Amino acid sequence: MTNQSSPAPLQRPAIVGHRGASAHAPENTLAAFRRALEDGAQLLECDVHLSADGEVVVMHDETIDRTVASDSPLRTGAIGELTRAQLDTVLLEGGERVPSLAELLEMTTAPVFIEVKVAAAAQAVAEILTALPKGSPAAASTVISFHADALAEIRRTTETPVSYLVGQVDEGAIATARELGAAGIGPSIKVLSLQAAEAVHEAGLAVNPWTVNTVPQLEVALACGVDTITTDDPAWVQRELDVRLG
């Protein structure tokens, strides 16, 4: 009888609610974020833009057009051209409103991956983060972005960790992340490979892929030993991890 070592157990990644539990509630709304927390997400993910008067607001697109409800008083417009007062009149699906980043960070019981969609918003985001109570869940948040200059501003002015979003994992992306002092890299799950994940981990960075919504994508994420799983459906990922990892 020969001695055979057992394979190392798969680590259990943290579940990140992508725009909240956006499979079950209107994306990037307080309802979606609450649902994600109820469904077992350990972190939330949101997108932020600047309003015309400098308010950091939570929305993915540059305009309200795609997510606005059909009966909204205001149905079209760019976030950067609308004031906070105008955005307050916008009605989203399910009767939800456009939240501010401050509102989300006040209500959350978990850290947030805050995606800065435009580099110009970085300073305002930094000011909000700096003002957070040290012991609050939101104080453990991470800023993520495709814009290296936005992440550099966050690193320069706050103690908040950052994760560099990339379309492809290569030597240049890893080098940029290290130069930024980033805690991780966030590639699309569609381009993630075991070789890429190993290179990121060897560089001392976390692997934070997006967006995992199918069984094949989940299997890739687990095989790559990712640190977080960003998904539209935290409850589904929770069930899958329970079955696969116990």
Which residues are covered by each model-predicted region?
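N-terminal amphipathic alpha-helix/helix-capping segment at the start of soluble metabolic enzymes
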Residues: M1-G17, A152, E198
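Metal-dependent phosphodiesterase/phospholipase catalytic core, i.e.
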Residues: R12-P13, H60-P161, L165-G167, A203
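Conserved, mostly hydrophobic/aromatic
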Residues: H18, A36, D47, L87, ...
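Active-site beta-loop-alpha junctions enriched in small/polar residues
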Residues: G20, H49-D53, D61-E62, K117-A119, ...
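Alpha-helical segments flanking ligand/cofactor-binding loops in enzyme cores
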Residues: L30, R34, A102, A152, ...
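C-terminal active-site rim and adjoining tail of enzyme catalytic domains
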Residues: L91-V98, S163-G246
